[in-house]
Regions:
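Helix C-cap/helix->beta junction micro-motif
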Residues: 130-133, 163, 219-220
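EAL-family c-di-GMP phosphodiesterase catalytic domain
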Residues: 1-17, 22-26, 43-46, 56-61, ...
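Structural preference for beta-strand elements that scaffold enzyme active sites
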Residues: 33, 49-51, 101-105, 136-140, ...
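Alpha-helical scaffolding segments of alpha/beta enzyme cores, especially the outer helices
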Residues: 91, 118-125, 152-162, 180, ...
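Catalytic core of bacterial c-di-GMP phosphodiesterases, primarily the EAL and HD-GYP domains
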Residues: 79-152
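Active-site and channel-lining beta-strand-loop segments
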Residues: 31-57
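PAS and related sensory helical modules
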Residues: 61-70
Length: 303
């Protein structure tokens, strides 16, 4: 037998091990950094909570959230990544903390996977291990655009609510799909797609949509969050439209530590004299808000 054929037989018997994916090392070493961005109650200027934003190690190939997500999807490790990010955020948050709630992102597909009782125990265990009460946690449902397993998603969000968590629906647009999911999941927090709150002062149609969505939020008992609020004028517009909560660079940049007070420039805007909008009549009747939305669904920035 030749040496070549012997080597081939040995390779078949003991195949070479596949090298671990680089993301595996990131998760095993805990090489993740958490930043916290404040979410502000617009009527009072108080800190409602902070969204936890996770990054990879600085100057690494997986520094950005998108790079981490792309690597996780390629390696079929998205749930592992998201649970690791959640654990890291809870660990860094600490207990007790003086600045309200912590907002944690979980994709709709991961929540579907966690709807199985055995998997859900892993999620529940994170709150216990890091001593953060579930009542101080808001789970943001992200990446729900292409989801089809609505029953499993609803099972998981219902189980989280039973623990005491609040549910937030992220990246909501004035589209029929977003509104259907809103009414189905009944989240206590609705976070608008950032395109709906950017450059508001130059797009009056957006302010009309904000007012209509604010009415719908009132009727469903949800708090509406405007994201990407980047200047004083846009802050005034979202406040005057009746939006409850806001986040963005004008209100506070993501930082390694949570803050207990709003920055001075935003406090000055919110301290200006203004008249809060009247709430819509007949809470629970969605017809008026839905009628207004029908005229706006499908506009260019809501696809």
């Amino acid at each position: 037998m030749s040496d070549v054929s012997l080597v081939q037989r040995l390779l078949k018997r003991w195949p070479a091990k596949t090298p671990p994916h680089p993301l595996q090392a990131v998760l095993e070493q805990g090489a993740l950094e958490t930043l916290y961005q404040p979410i502000i109650a617009l009527q009072s200027g108080a800190i409602d909570g902070h969204e936890a934003l996770v990054r990879g190690q600085k100057d690494s190939d997986m520094e950005t959230p998108q790079a981490l997500l792309d690597a996780a999807q390629l390696a079929q490790m998205q749930m592992e990544l998201e649970l690791a990010c959640m654990g890291r955020a809870l660990q860094s948050w600490g207990y007790p903390h003086t600045a309200g709630r912590i907002y944690l992102n979980l994709s709709a597909h991961t929540l579907v996977a966690l709807s199985e009782p055995k998997s859900f125990k892993r999620l529940e265990g994170l709150f216990l291990v890091h001593r953060v009460p579930a009542k101080r946690v808001v789970v943001e449902v992200t990446q729900h655009r292409k989801l089809k397993e609505f029953n499993a998603l609803e099972r998981c969000t219902t189980a989280l609510q039973a623990l005491g968590c609040a549910i937030a629906l992220d990246d909501v647009k004035a589209s029929r799909r977003s509104l259907d999911l809103w009414l189905r999941l009944k989240p206590s927090v609705v976070k608008l797609d950032s395109r709906m709150t950017q450059d508001l002062q130059n797009d009056p149609d957006k302010a009309k949509v904000l007012r209509t969505l604010s009415n719908l939020a009132f009727k469903t008992g949800a708090s509406l969050v405007a994201k990407a609020v980047e200047d004083a004028e846009d802050l005034r517009i979202v406040r005057d439209a009746g939006v409850h909560l806001a986040q963005g660079h004008f209100l506070g940049f993501p930082a390694p530590a949570a803050v207990d007070t709003l920055n001075l420039r935003a406090r000055n805007v919110l301290a200006e004299k203004w008249t809060p909008p009247e709430p819509p009549s007949r809470p629970g009747d969605l017809s008026a808000a839905d009628s207004g939305l029908q005229k706006l669904v499908g506009m260019r920035w809501f696809d």
